[in-house]
C-alpha cells in the first residue's frame, strides 16, 4: 500500500466541502457586481470554467462551457467550438467527473440543500432517469443549436434558455435585483425557469444531486471519460472484505467494488471515508494505494 496516497485520499475526501467553496468563489470572483446588476465582460470571459456556472452571473469569472458550446456548435463563422471540444476532452481525460464532485458550483449548491434536515429519499430505483441527461445533451446542447442559429451565425442556447436553473439562480435573479430595466423585462420564460429552479431545490433536499444525476449535460460529457481519466478511484482487492460499506455510502448509486470508475461516480470520496479496511483511494496517473492495481 502506498501510505502517502492513502492518507492524501482521505484528507482530500475530508476537506471536499472547503474545496467546493473555494472553487465556487474562484469561479465567481467579481462579488461586487452582484450588487450593481452588471455582468463582468473582461478578457477572462473568453475562458471557460470547468463546472456549470452561468455566464450571465454578475460575479462570474469566466464562461460556462455548455453555454459557449451551444453558441458556436452550429456556427459557420466561428471555430471556437474546437477550443470548447478540446477543453472538454482535456478536463475529461484528466479529471473526469471529479469536476462534478469538487469544482462545480451548482453541484455544491445541491450538496448544501441536501444537508437540510428532513426525510431523504433514495434514487436507487430511479436509475433509468440517468439517461435523460444524455438525451438533453444530444437534443438541447448539440442538435437544436446546430439547426437554429441567429443572424450572426451563433447557435441559440436552448439548454440555457429553456432548462438550466443555474441561469436563474446566478444570472436572472441577481441581475434583476440590481437592474430595474432587466427587472421590468422579465416575463413568462423567467417564471417558467423559476418553476424549474424551485423544483430542483425541492428535489435536492429530498434526493441527492437530482440535477447532476438526471439533467446536467456537462456531467454527461465528463461521464464519458470516467473510465479513461487520469484521476480514478481504485479498490485494493487484497484488502477488500466485501462488506459493502462503500456502496452504501455512495449517494450516486454506484457499486464501488464492481465498477469504481462508473460514469456516475463523481469522485466525492464518500466510499474512501466509509471503507473500514482503507482499501479504497484515489489513483492519479497510475499511482494508487496499492502496488499492483488490477481495478
Feature names for model-found ranges:
Residues 1-257, 263-295:
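Non-ligating segments of multi-cofactor redox enzymes
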Amino acid at each position: 500500500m502506498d501510505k502517502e496516497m492513502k492518507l492524501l485520499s482521505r484528507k482530500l475526501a475530508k476537506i471536499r466541502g472547503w474545496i467546493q467553496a473555494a472553487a465556487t468563489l474562484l469561479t465567481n470572483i467579481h462579488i461586487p457586481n452582484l450588487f450593481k446588476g452588471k455582468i463582468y465582460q473582461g478578457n477572462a470571459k473568453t475562458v471557460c470554467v470547468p463546472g456549470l456556472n452561468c455566464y450571465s452571473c454578475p460575479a462570474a469569472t469566466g464562461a460556462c462551457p455548455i453555454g459557449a458550446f451551444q453558441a458556436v456548435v452550429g456556427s459557420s463563422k466561428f471555430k471556437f467550438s474546437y477550443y470548447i471540444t478540446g477543453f472538454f476532452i482535456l478536463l475529461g481525460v484528466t479529471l473526469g467527473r471529479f469536476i462534478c464532485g469538487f469544482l462545480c458550483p451548482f453541484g455544491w449548491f445541491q450538496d448544501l440543500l441536501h444537508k437540510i434536515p428532513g426525510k431523504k429519499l433514495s434514487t436507487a430505483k430511479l436509475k433509468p432517469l440517468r439517461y435523460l441527461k444524455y438525451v438533453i445533451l444530444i437534443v438541447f446542447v448539440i442538435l437544436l443549436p446546430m439547426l437554429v442559429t441567429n443572424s450572426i451565425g451563433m447557435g441559440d442556447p436552448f439548454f440555457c434558455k429553456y432548462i438550466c436553473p443555474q441561469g436563474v439562480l446566478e444570472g436572472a435573479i441577481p441581475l434583476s435585483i440590481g437592474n430595474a430595466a432587466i427587472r421590468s423585462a422579465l416575463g413568462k420564460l423567467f417564471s417558467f425557469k423559476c418553476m424549474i429552479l424551485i423544483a430542483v431545490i425541492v428535489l435536492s433536499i429530498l434526493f441527492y444531486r437530482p440535477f447532476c444525476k438526471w439533467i446536467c449535460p456537462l456531467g454527461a460529457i465528463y461521464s464519458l471519460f470516467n473510465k479513461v481519466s487520469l484521476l480514478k478511484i481504485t479498490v485494493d482487492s487484497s484488502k477488500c472484505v466485501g462488506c459493502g460499506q462503500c456502496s452504501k455510502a455512495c449517494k450516486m448509486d454506484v457499486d464501488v467494488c464492481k465498477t469504481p470508475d462508473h460514469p456516475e461516480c463523481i469522485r466525492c470520496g464518500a466510499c474512501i471515508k466509509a471503507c473500514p479496511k482503507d482499501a479504497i483511494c484515489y489513483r492519479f496517473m497510475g499511482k494508487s494505494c496499492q502496488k499492483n492495481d488490477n481495478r
